Amino acid sequence: MEGLVYKSTGSWYVVKDIATGAAYDCRIKGRFRLKGIKNTNPIAVGDRVTFEVEEGTKGIITEIKPRDNYIIRRSVNLSKQTHIIASNIDLAFLVVTLNNPLTSTTFIDRFLVTAEAYGIKTILLFNKIDTYNAEEIDEVKFLAQLYRQAGYECIGISAATGKNIAKVMTAMEGKTCVVSGHSGSGKSTLINAIDPELHLKTAAISEQHLQGQHTTTFAEMFDLPNGARIIDTPGIRGFGMVEIEKEELTDYFPEFFALKHHCKFHNCLHTDEPQCAIKEALEEGTIAWSRYKSYLQILNGEERDN
């Protein structure tokens, strides 16, 4: 039977039969698990799989179909292992907040580079705009302009009040979408605003650490009335980069890619080389210094997100 993975708990997977929509609790066939996969999760939400029904609503996954794409990051404290956040994605939403918790530009850029590398369109959602003062609203506008200049769509939203949620729903129509961001950024509140019938758990920010409490432990996909599917993911504190070669990195910063052919050297890394179009654009102010800083950190293999 052909199915789609809707939920992963690490050892069990909820798989929906593509033909009937019936849900089955499946596990991985033993030998299939031991193929030397270095991911912490060999099967991800969004995967297309072949499975066999054992009894009732229990089943065994026997094959993963080739993935169109996926979003991947290095696992926490397990530098040799990776974690696939979700697969077969049409559109990613990154939920950004100025504070409680702070989403740094470095974190945003790491996520965007990974999405670019796998051909996944990303929209930045600046959440909680109903809670910001005038100075903070100006900062949101500045950041949104910075990322629009780099080629990204940005929407200011309030998941709590419903502001601009209709815009988000229009963008999602008929697509498989993933919602990502830090714990406490409002991902589950956003999904509840999109479809109140889902009743996803939400939690307040920890006052002591100003970080979100994890309310989503495992990734899970939901069907929406507008023909879309939305994947809710656990909050991410750090975003370790994987699988990107130094020579390719420029290609995943759209505003760098547009200029790289004007560099004197075809293999220019935009660090110390003469007549570099990217560094000239930096001096002219057409490329943001924060983006260049993120580029250098990723290029040099630095793992910090600030």
Regions found by a protein language model. Name each.
Residues 88-96, 119-129, 150-156:
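Conserved beta-strand/loop subsegment of P-loop NTPase cores
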Residues 106-121:
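Histidine-anchored nucleotide/phosphate-binding helix
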Residues 131-185:
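Canonical P-loop GTPase G-domain recognition
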Residues 11, 38-55, 65-85, 121-122, ...:
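Helix-rich effector regions associated with P-loop NTPase G domains
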Residues 102, 132, 163, 237-240:
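Catalytic P-loop NTPase motifs of RecA-like helicase/translocase cores
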Residues 1-105:
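N-terminal accessory targeting/assembly segments
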